[in-house]
């Protein structure tokens, strides 16, 4: 069996640096192999050049290491949101663009995305902490702007953020699971679905979540009519 080359003793205070090296090595193995079967503590230790016990000083087990890997991955999501949202004044359009950016982000690195949502450890994960502190704060701020415009009650902001996330996550997960389906070029179907969710949710936010289908149909027809009372064509 191939031995692990000895790594020189790290200087005092370099534990955080070693943890970053461990996360990088695990990320590389994930991307190289396409799943986590190759990401054993021994394999990661070999890649970094340390002994397996050194890994356990920083991560309790493989699941904890994978959680840290996925958390680092999701740190990039806020930057993706900023790239599409900064400079967009309309909060509704901003919410839509962030939803599309989420789907693009998820489908660009499927192995990391799948593993991030496969973890089932009790309590908040590092991924949850990262999202709550960055990307989701940006979404919540946008939804709060919509609430200030009267599209939702302010008390519904958290619920609406969860609904928008569920929609984006759902379409991203289905695109990853069924890539052979006709999704259209440049995420066309994903954009159509997310646009329907954003516009539909703001409409219901104004009319009331318990609005019946017939009442919504009547309201939509009324909005479609021209000022003289004729149907708008």
Where on the chain are the PLM-derived regions?
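Amphipathic alpha-helical interaction segments
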Residues: 21, 43, 97, 101, ...
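Hydrophobic alpha-helical connector segments
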Residues: 82-112, 136, 164
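Hydrophobic/aromatic-rich alpha-helical bundle segments in the mid-to-C-terminal region
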Residues: 124-129, 133, 148-196, 204-224
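Amphipathic alpha-helical linker/stalk segments
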Residues: 72-96, 127-130, 140, 144-147
